[in-house]
Amino acid sequence: MELFWLEHKKLWRKKIVKIFVLLCFVYCVIFGSILSFQWFGFGSSDDYTSAFGNNFDGYTVIKDSQEYALSFGGELTDETLQKIVSDYQQMEADGMEEELEKTDWQIVNSWLGTLYPELRDTSNYKTMISYVDPDKLTGFYERRQQVLDEFLEVSGQVGAEKEFLHQIERKVEKPFHYEWVEGWSTLLGSMVADLGVVMALFLGIVLSSLFAGEWHDNTSTLVLTTRNGWGKIALAKILTGLAFTVELFALLAVSNVISQLFFMGTAGWDMPIQNIKLIAVAPMNMLQAEIYEYAFVLLGAIGFAGIVMFISAAVKNNVLTLLLSLAVVYGPMMIAEYLPYEMQKALDLIPLVGSSTDIFRTNTFRIFGKLIWSPYLLITIPVLIGILCMPFAIKSWSRRMKA
C-alpha cells in the first residue's frame, strides 16, 4: 500500500498532469456543461448564424421550457400532440418568436417526420410543425409500431432477431410520459455520450508515461535495484493508473451532475428515452439512460487505462506509447465507415470506441447462437479487455527490467 501511495503522489506531483487535468475539466465541465446550458446550448437566440451568438440566459430559458411542457398534462397522447402542434402554430401566427424557443419544436418536428411522412409538403420551406394539420395527427402509438417494424425489416433484422427486439420493446410503458425533452436529448446525446472520447485523450497523455517514463527519466536502474523489486512496483503503478482514471472520471461526472441539477433539476427524469428517439426499444427512462452512459464511460475508461499501461510497459518511448494509445481509440473511429457493418460492431467493443448512445439503437450481437443486445456487451467487454491487459503489462515490465 505504501508503494501505491508513493506512486500516486509521484503522478499527481507532475505539473504536466495537473495542467492536463485542468484542461480536461475546463473542456468537459466549463464548456461542455455549464456554458452549454447557460449560453450556446440553450441561451435564447440573438444571432441565428451561430450558437455563440446566443444570449447568456440559458437557465431562464430552461425553466420556462420546463414549465411550458408541463401545461400539456404529462401523458403523450394523440390529443397532447395535436395540442402541442396547434399551440406552436398559433404562437408562430402571432409573431411570438421568443415564446417559440421554449417549445420542444425540434423534438416534436422529428416525431412528425418519423410518424407522418405523408403529411410532409416538399414545396413548403417551413418545418412540418409549422404547417401540418393537427387534426390529422392520430394513431401515434400504432404508427410508431409500424415504423419500428419497417425499420427492422429494412435493417435486415427479421425472424428471431426481430422477435428478440420486440420482447425488449414490449417492456416500454405506454402512453409515454411527457415533459420538456430537448434538455435530456442534449444531455444524453452529447454531453455525457462524448465524455469518454475526450477522457481518452487525456488518459492517454497522462498514463502513457507511467511505465515508459522510467526510461525517459533515467530511473529504470533505481527501480531495478530497489528492495521492493519490479513486481510490487509494477502493481503499484497499475493501481495508480486505475486510481487516476477513477479520480478523473469522478471529478468530471460529479461536476457535470451538479451542473445538470442546477440548470435542469430532476424534471423529466422518468420520461422514456423513446421521447428522444421514437424507434428506440430500450425500456429505460432518462435517469436510467444517464446512469448507463456514465457506467459506459467509467468502465470504458478503466479498460482503456489497462491498454495504455500495457503499451507503456512494452514500449520505452513516451511519444510512441502516446501515439499507439491514441490510435487504439481514434484509429477505429476514423476507419469504421469504410468497413463492413459487422466489423464496425466488433470495433465498438474496444474501450471508448463504441458509443453509449447504442441504447437508442437496435444493434445486437449473436454469440454462440444466442442474441445479445449490444449495450450489454458495450459496458462489459471493454473493461474485461483492460483487465486482461494488466497482467501482460507486469510481465512486459518484468522482461524489460531483467534485460
Regions found by a protein language model. Give the residues of each.
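Central hydrophobic cores of alpha-helical transmembrane segments
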Residues: 21-25, 319-332, 350-351
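Aromatic- and glycine-rich beta-strand/loop motifs that create alpha-glucan
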Residues: 1-20
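Junction motif at the cytosolic side of a transmembrane helix
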Residues: 5-7, 11, 310-314, 381-403
